[in-house]
Structure formats: structure tokens, C-alpha cells
């Protein structure tokens, strides 16, 4: 049974807004890291957003800032920086020092038909930079570029 794709957020700025300036800043940090590092593939700028001793819970990327940079360089080309995310963002929320994103994730079943799932990432912010990351990624070979998961 096929399920419909989750609804994508039309207004990213509304998702970035918060009455709490710290939460708004944390959401903006994660959003801009997605735009500049993950979407545009600019690994050299990762240090603007990510701690040197970054803790990574994705089994396909090594620890630390250098692990993120190596992963980005090995999975995607450099692209133009855009004002908004192309990835199908559903929601962006912050609580305390954590920011969570959710995206629509199109996949293919064994017969080649597209179905939709939801991908979640959780980030811990420390001293104005991303210090830790969790996601549901399983070991994969070859490494994937999430920019290929657009609807």
C-alpha cells in the first residue's frame, strides 16, 4: 500500500522563527549548514558551523570536523549556494540545545516504484556550533548524496 508524500513546508523562514533568540539562532545554524555544506557541498566551510571534535553517529562518516569534510567531498560536487533548501523540508524544531530536521525521502521499492518515507536528523549545539549529530542511516556502500533524494 502506497502512502502519500508528507507535506513539504512552503515557508522556511516561518520554520526558522522563534520567540526565543537562542532557539532561532540554533535553527538558523543548522539550516545554513545544510544550505552551505550539505546542499552546496562546500566542505571547506564546514568549520563555520561544526566543532572540530564533532561527534558523528552516522556509520558512514568519520568523527570530527575532518570526518564531515571528507564525507562531503566524497559524496557530492560543489554547487551554487542557494537562499533556501532544495531538499523537501517538512519541519525544523529546536528545544534546549537540540535542533531536529525532518525531510521527505523518496525511495524505490523492488519493482522500481517510488514510495515516500521521512528522514530525521538531530543536532546538538554547543558554543554556537554543531557538536553532535544523529540520524537513522545504516551502513551503505557507496556513500549517498542526500541531494539526490528530492521529490
Question: Where in this protein do the model-derived segments appear?
Answer:
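Generic short beta-strand segments
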Residues: 73, 102-108
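Hydrophobic/aromatic beta-strand elements that line small-molecule binding cavities or substrate pockets
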Residues: 87-93, 104, 118-123
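Short, low-complexity N-terminal intrinsically disordered segments enriched in polar/charged residues
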Residues: 1-44, 48, 150-151
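Short beta-strand edge/turn micro-motifs at domain boundaries
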Residues: 1, 118-149
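A solvent-exposed, acidic/Ser-Thr-rich amphipathic alpha-helical stretch
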Residues: 43-97
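Short, cysteine-centered beta-strand-loop-beta hairpins and adjacent loop/turn segments enriched
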Residues: 77-81, 107-115
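Short beta-strand segments enriched in hydrophobic/aromatic residues
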Residues: 50, 105-107, 137
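Short, solvent-exposed coil/turn segments at beta-strand boundaries
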Residues: 46, 94-98, 123-131
Amino acid at each position: 500500500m502506497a502512502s502519500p508524500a508528507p507535506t513539504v513546508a512552503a515557508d522556511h523562514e516561518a520554520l526558522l522563527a522563534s520567540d526565543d533568540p537562542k532557539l532561532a539562532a540554533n535553527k538558523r545554524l543548522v539550516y545554513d549548514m545544510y544550505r552551505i555544506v550539505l546542499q552546496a557541498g562546500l566542505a571547506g566551510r564546514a568549520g563555520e558551523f561544526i566543532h572540530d571534535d564533532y561527534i558523528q553517529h552516522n556509520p558512514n562518516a568519520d568523527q570530527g570536523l575532518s570526518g564531515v569534510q571528507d564525507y562531503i567531498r566524497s559524496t557530492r560536487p560543489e554547487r551554487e549556494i542557494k537562499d533556501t533548501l532544495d531538499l523537501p523540508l517538512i519541519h525544523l524544531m529546536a528545544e534546549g540545545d537540540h535542533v531536529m530536521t525532518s525531510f521527505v525521502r523518496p525511495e524505490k521499492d523492488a519493482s522500481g516504484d517510488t514510495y515516500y518515507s521521512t528522514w530525521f536528523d538531530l543536532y546538538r549545539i554547543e558554543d554556537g556550533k554543531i557538536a553532535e549529530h544523529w540520524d537513522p542511516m545504516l551502513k551503505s556502500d557507496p556513500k549517498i548524496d542526500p541531494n539526490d533524494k528530492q521529490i
